[in-house]
Amino acid sequence: VENTLLGLGCERSDFTRPTSEFSGGWRMRIELAKLLLKSPDVLLLDEPTNHLDIESIGWLEDFICNSSKAVVVISHDRKFVDDITTRTIEVTMGRIYDYKATYSQYLELRKERREQQMKQYEEQQKMIADTKEFIERFKGTYSKTLQVQSRVKMLEKLQLIEVDEEDTSRLRLKFPPSPRSGAYPVQMSEVAMSFDGKNVFSGVNLTVERGDKIAFVGRNGEGKSTLVKCIMGQLQNEGKLELGHNVQIGYFAQNQASLLDGELTVFQTIDDVAKGDVRNKIRDLLGAFMFGGEESTKKVKVLSGGERTRLAILKLLLEPVNLLILDEPTNHLDLKTKDVLKQALLDFDGTLIVVSHDRDFLDGLVSKVYEFGHGRVREHWCGIYEFRESKKMESRQ
């Protein structure tokens, strides 16, 4: 029991606390621990990593891989599903496809399947066009009556070949031009924060340079979102925290979705902020963020929380800013949409700060990691996997 709770991020001091004292995210961890300890024959997990930090996700992966039980998981965490699964089931367009493959292998197999579908679809469409032409040409010819009737019946009974939805992950989202910020968008000197006398972090001395792409990582409750709110001026910190010259911030947090105008449609929301060449790709962008077809005509007020989150992120990406701060942006995104977002952020020439536990999303995106823990913030000049390896080496020493 202790190993499971510690693995999922609890402290020993938490063991005797009433569950009513914990936040919703921590209660989800407690429920997950209870489920794992029951040792069921089949484990059904729906987005189990959403409320976990990077360390806890790694522990859960090891737990599942070392278990002999069957596991069925729904997840948008590519690294997680690649590490724990050997079979991928795709549900698309009213059909189910079963692949004896990891997610990465499935992507290649799906691509081959779609190419085959497209070839069969094009052949069928040519056959349909030829048949309709024959019917039109000979429908008044007595000697061809039986052949015409036969072809009409054939078309009526024909089962049309459907082609899987196109992969939108290659879609490139171009940021609007924004004014250049100063060389140091954010500077911190002896920054500290506490709540009700309890220290969250102290002695933070960090300089964010223009063009940096930085990940904030650490266990939940260690102050990642708190420092973001200090940068945004939403919380008053101790010490000195300064924004650089001409810094224009674009900020996303889960509550940003509630600030959208509920009376506008999805399309109008994006149309209002889209400028330049991107205006010609609004529908493609909406499709990439899962608002294709009639979904784009829905009013914002009828969207679910996850749908509003997706729309808020897309809207933010189209606004001219030079410092992007994203707090858990991938929680409501599917894998393809995450790819579109990641590519957009790679192309972004401003400064990026992202709070995330999604290792695949952070891999190749960030070149600095700020680690939050034990009341401190440590700076690591490396990507997320180099950081993870350094932490493993520390734990062995």
Show where each model-derived region lies:
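Amphipathic alpha-helical coiled-coil segments
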Residues: 157-167
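Short, amphipathic alpha-helical segments that act as regulatory/interfacial helices
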Residues: 132, 156-159, 366
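ABC ATP-binding cassette signature C-motif
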Residues: 1-121, 170, 174-397
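Short amphipathic alpha-helical coiled-coil/interface segments
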Residues: 1, 150-159
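ABC ATPase nucleotide-binding domains
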Residues: 117-139, 144-153, 169, 389-397
